[in-house]
Amino acid sequence: MTDLSHIRNFSIIAHIDHGKSTLADRFIQHCGGLSAREMEAQVLDSMDIERERGITIKAQSVTLSYTSKSGKVYQLNFIDTPGHVDFSYEVSRSLAACEGALLVVDAAQGVEAQSVANCYTALDQGLEVIPVLNKIDLPQAEPERVASEIEDIIGIDATDAVRCSAKSGLGIEDVLEVLIKSVPAPVGDIDAPLQALIIDSWFDNYLGVVSLVRVTQGCLKTKDKIILKSLGKPHVVDMVGVFTPKRKETGILKAGEVGFVVAGIKEILGAPVGDTITHASTSTVPQLPGFKKVKPQVYAGLFPVSSDDYENFRDALGKLTLNDASLFYEPESSEALGFGFRCGFLGMLHMEIIQERLEREYDLDLITTAPTVIYEVEKNDGSVVYVDNPSKLPDLGTIAEMREPIVEANMLMPQAYLGAVITLCIEKRGVQKDMQYLGGQVALKYELPMAEVVLDFFDKLKSVSRGFASLDYNFVRFEAAKLVRLDVLINSEKVDALALIVHRDTAQYKGRSLADKMKELIPRQMFDVAIQAAIGGQVVARTTVKALRKNVIAKCYGGDVSRKKKLLEKQKAGKKRMKQVGRVEIPQEAFLAVLKVDS
């Protein structure tokens, strides 16, 4: 199928739970991509975690052939995208390979902030956006209201939005027909020198690096000698093909097509995402504009429970970074936890998922320290340093000013929950920037400290709005704030992994609740364990985990009191000696207790 006019590259934009993966299943079924026996729910969510949590994390691609009502056969290249706010960079990568996007909106729930953000990304990249109303067979569906919401909030014409139900398969053919009519065919010269963009890469234990590519011009065949523009190393192509969703070798990919390429690259960083592939003979071909590098928002220390796992842990992180370009890591050592890595993530969900993938796919046992954001610190001599780890904060005497990152949060919610959401934003030290009433919905714009947003703001927003509010946020600037480091001392020793950077106004309260939390989590020892929270040299809170003690006077029946006193004194002296040499084991829960401190 060499005719470019018969190729359509598209992706689906939707909020979590609006039926994106189910719609993809129906497309595959309708176009006969898999036999009825191989078909299963959420075919494209290939990771166990994706299935269990019901979310899409990685972008996947499928090539289907569809015979339209007019009898023409079209090749549909469909790239699945995630919907959660933490994975928005995956979306922008997928969209770069498409000419069109389906904006899927739940006809019962209406438009949500995340789909608005992704939709604007698509429009900025010049894609044709087609609104689709899903779940119209639900009794509570209101397609007219939702169509007018799409027009009010996003500003694209939704009068003739396609209506379908991905679950029952109703209207799927209409969606495909509109897709063929509205999405432009790709442009590209098959005879020009090869130019292909790497959308995604992952590591296969047998094949090495497998890359998902979009060919913009020329064609890519097996046995071709190729180079990657940023690295310049030549490789020979072993395998070229498409996913139907199973891997299918075709031997050739032409301009406008999306498929995979395997070139026997064994180095983990051998095929960076966003790089350009070309033939070794035409190495002067210009590099395609890649993707903007995403900056991690949340940093946490990850440490293997047993130090023997350190090497495996490093390899596992390398393989994950190939598959997930936004993960950042560098080696770190902690007095309390030994050697590990400081990792950067896009948000809390991203962090949980990376930890879960490391534990499942690579069989590691990990301890995570409390996540922090990155702070800008100006020292007295005028130099500026960035701190992503509280224990690396310079001495308070040398600091002229500390600045915390501020994000702009866009929230959409029904009017009934406006009051509760505003109260939550004020608690989180937010500043209101804008408020608009759009039909039955309200769009709120707030500036909030990132530290307040990334930890538990999303969960709290969902609970105060009974799940109806949605959130999208992006970093705006660093702003000066009164920040201090809160240290936790256990038996007068600082535990570096438990340090926190907090706002001065809430430091005392946080210190007290953190010390109380620790008291619950640290098991009782044979001696008293003093837990203190301190700012600099000033202790702001203290609790004690009382010692377990044996009843040494149980064997004394009656008799002289001095005998009992002697035994009690002896026990006391023993405990004192024990306290000098005894070490307190801190359980994993205690490191994460920092998260549970209600601010």
Curated annotation (Swiss-Prot):
Q: Its Gene Ontology biological processes? A: positive regulation of translation
Question: Which residues are in the tr-type G domain?
Answer: 5-187
Among PROSITE patterns, the record links this protein to: G_TR_1 (PS00301), G_TR_2 (PS51722)
Entry's localization field: Cell inner membrane
Please report the record's description of how this protein sits within the membrane: Peripheral membrane protein
Where would you say this protein principally sits, based on its record? membrane
Provide the alphabetized UniProt keywords: Cell inner membrane, Cell membrane, GTP-binding, Hydrolase, Membrane, Nucleotide-binding, Protein biosynthesis
Quote the protein name from its UniProt record: Elongation factor 4
Q: Which family does it belong to?
A: Belongs to the TRAFAC class translation factor GTPase superfamily. Classic translation factor GTPase family. LepA subfamily.
